[in-house]
Amino acid sequence: MDVVEKWWCTKGQHRYRNAGHLTILADGGGSNSSSSRVWKYGLQTRVCDRHGLNVTVAHYPSGASKWNPIEHRLFSEISKNWAARPLDSYETILKYLRTTTTTTGLRVRAHLVRKAYKKGVKITREQMDELDLTNDEAMPK
């Protein structure tokens, strides 16, 4: 959640001044999965409530994240940029990420979050009931 909020505060709200809505394309697994209460609670409290945004999250099912336009356009370029090079430190990884570009001029911006996150954070049923969540009618399989 820190990265989404940081992006909104440093880039998004300036680039999209009158935006009241944010769409996030997310992989279906990991910490931002569609079943993650921590992810949903964080989006509501840290992005929606704090910044007055409505957020739609489109989760890609397992094995389909390659259709995410960012992954589709950038990951192959990142892989080519750091191919056969030892990724032996965060600084090295960030260097290769930041120097990746596409032929159309798309660039990668990357920063390291050094925050130590707590493990086992639980969001209660009561906390979930407070959230303003709506599932889309069409949820393709």
PLM region spans:
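Short, basic/hydrophobic alpha-helical segments
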Residues: 1-24
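Phosphate/oxyanion-binding active-site loops and adjacent basic polyanion-contact surfaces
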Residues: 1-6, 32-39, 86
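Extended hydrophobic secondary-structure segments that form protein cores and membrane-embedded regions
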Residues: 21-28, 57-62, 96-97
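Acidic, metal-coordinating catalytic cores used for nucleic-acid/nucleotide bond scission
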Residues: 26-39, 61-67
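Short secondary-structure boundary/capping segments
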Residues: 38-43, 73-77
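Two-metal-ion acidic nuclease core segments, chiefly of the RNase H-like superfamily
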Residues: 39-57
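RNase H-like two-metal-ion nuclease catalytic core shared by retroviral integrases
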Residues: 57-79
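C-terminal accessory extensions appended to soluble enzyme cores
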Residues: 84-141
